[in-house]
Amino acid sequence: MIPKVLIIIPAYNEEKNIEKVVRNIEENFSQYDYIIVNDGSTDSTKDVLERNHFHYLDLPQNLGIGGGVQTGYKYADANGYDIAIQIDGDGQHDPAFIAQLIQPILDGQADMVIGSRFLEKEGFQTSSMRRLGIRYFKHLLHALCGVTITDATSGFRASSAALTRYFTKDYAEDYPEPEAILSSVLNGFQVMEIPVVMRERQGGESSINALKSVYYMIKVTLAIIISRIRFWRKREKPCF
């Protein structure tokens, strides 16, 4: 039986990138469905989507990456998809790795599979500051729930139908990737990584700067610790 796979593409002000990303999927990976979630873009992203007759959902205001991705998960769950794939709308993630992302889910080995640029350290490795932050989250997650994830902030990931349904009810609003790993593990879902090669952003500017990076680390750290404490109180015992 061929699995029903949906690619979720959250997009905020990606007028310079989104057409290339979607054209690549349509022309080379047509076996997968896709949905773009236009997260209240203030540039001409929506015009690009309409002009090209792309499949998209239009949010009336910016909900942040978490809200955009969760909207995609709700769409996937409502339409009966077996696997939901998240990729960024800036061209960094290569859909050629999707087959490798979904295979562990099909084999029953995982509920979430994350594409890591650090397992084989090929391709674009991001800035030294971001690498430091990613390494920090690797150790934090290991300390809190025992899982070792080398690329916890990677937005290139696949989720099973069961995990997708869970995310429709519980998903962090802002900078959700590390927290989604923690909540998945604590709730009994299996999480693993595979090596992928990522590219530099294809155009435009990232919304993450040095100041936002510091804010991101503080906010996500607090969110993860609070989530872990709440789970501990709920179960009355730690998971490690």
Residue ranges and their predicted role:
Residues 81-92:
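Short beta-strand-to-loop acidic/aromatic patch adjacent to the donor-nucleotide binding site
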